[in-house]
């Protein structure tokens, strides 16, 4: 099974206080004046001071090879803040920085390195606070209330650039070609990297690098850049600058999973749960006009209305896509929830998943073989598990120390209230019955007889997402479930973490002295009627898993307090995020896909119609990243996920997989 941890950098500090890589025997920045060198080489070499005021787009995208200590990023962020203060009315409003790092620093080493530049402390402290775990792939950090976005891609840049989604092609405005010197790290400075830089660069994009090595200049020229030498910084004689003057036409490697966005900035979101709320915020941050239509009279009346929900990543013993997506989604969710300027009941007390029988123990052993960072997930023996959770269990398991619980109902309402302050328009008691394409817009028809017209539409209405002609063929299904609310007792109040077994039990919410225990599972059932049998089973599953635990007998469901909801799920346990696919056109256009992959056209979709759904039972974990992915896609901005994992979230994936194998789609 693949290992999912990234090796951190090993470094030491020399006499000047400069960090030095033990792996590459090279400094992370100049001993003389690393800050001024960055300003000269990368900001000056890309002419950013003169380009920012005349940039004709709200977003400026910079890509970098080798994040290191983050000096280049912090220096650019500082300069961007100065520009925004001096030019508040400029078209350019936001900065997006994409960087690749094979050996990321630990948070402690990062903080030590940042002590070198006190003037960057206000920006460095924000970076340190959100510094991600060493997991492979993309980590999106939203900084300065979302005005600055940092995408940290952990892994080998030559491998990662081959895994980028095609939507990133021709989007980069400036390249910082940095890293350890070519003589120290020749594996990075390859034609593959130079070609990737050219593929990602938009026409007119610039690049700058500290080196003047001939093979670097020639490689970049062969990739498509027009190169020139410039006086180097300090004692260095020369450096290189370049411009992408050509109009390259990158090919699509998997057109059947291609994602299209919108040139428009106006949309209707259908739904009223956590997905709709977070998507509204993500689009508003990008300057969209957003109208939310909800069938209920207030938010969070569906699956997002529970009192307590567990937050922890889904891991799989066999599905690589799940193991790539959910750890990243979980860490993004924690960063986002912690940064939201709203209040909601929550406790990041940890989550422990126990192996109560042989089958569950085998599953946990396979999950632990992923070798995830200990800060994300680690093994517990029986004694350690009992110390962690605070009650007798007599079995070990896997613990997620950064997990916990939150109140989805409060969170959803608070986020929608925040979005409303930022310009969100809300329309409650609006039940959508049909969508009709009209020229370049969509007409929405509601049960009341009202209609509305919007340039784009996002369906994020839970298990009702397949109620329309365009979405009826989607392979999603409803899952009804009941969560029981139980009063705490002295024994139950000892529970310190969310306990997962063949069900789950939360610690008490100190605001109401109640726990949540659940949940029943009724596939294909959309009923929200309270069931006495579900109430009994929620208790019985706990007793069956821990038959010797006296504290478990104190679970009292006789008060009949519970909440029934309906989730939307897929058989592969992954969300559906992206364009709504045209089922009939997909089957027609891709009828011979298995034999004609090289000539395939981009996937047939309904223009301007998007979806965010099938979050299953892990919506609290997946909704934040899914909302960010869809907002980025709709806005034609960089998407924070590799192409393979994005394909696993594509709403057409289950059909396309069969068509690629020449199998019939049913």
From Swiss-Prot:
Its EC number is 2.1.1.61, 1.5.-.-. NCBIfam families: MnmC_Cterm, PRK01747.1-1, PRK01747.1-2, PRK01747.1-3, PRK01747.1-5, tRNA_MNMC2. This is tRNA 5-methylaminomethyl-2-thiouridine biosynthesis bifunctional protein MnmC. It comes from Salmonella paratyphi B (strain ATCC BAA-1250 / SPB7). PANTHER family: SARCOSINE DEHYDROGENASE-RELATED (PTHR13847), TRNA 5-METHYLAMINOMETHYL-2-THIOURIDINE BIOSYNTHESIS BIFUNCTIONAL PROTEIN MNMC (PTHR13847:SF283). GO terms for biological process: methylation; tRNA wobble uridine modification. In the N-terminal section; belongs to the methyltransferase superfamily. tRNA (mnm(5)s(2)U34)-methyltransferase family. In the C-terminal section; belongs to the DAO family. Keywords: Cytoplasm, FAD, Flavoprotein, Methyltransferase, Multifunctional enzyme, Oxidoreductase, S-adenosyl-L-methionine, Transferase, tRNA processing. Its cofactor is FAD.
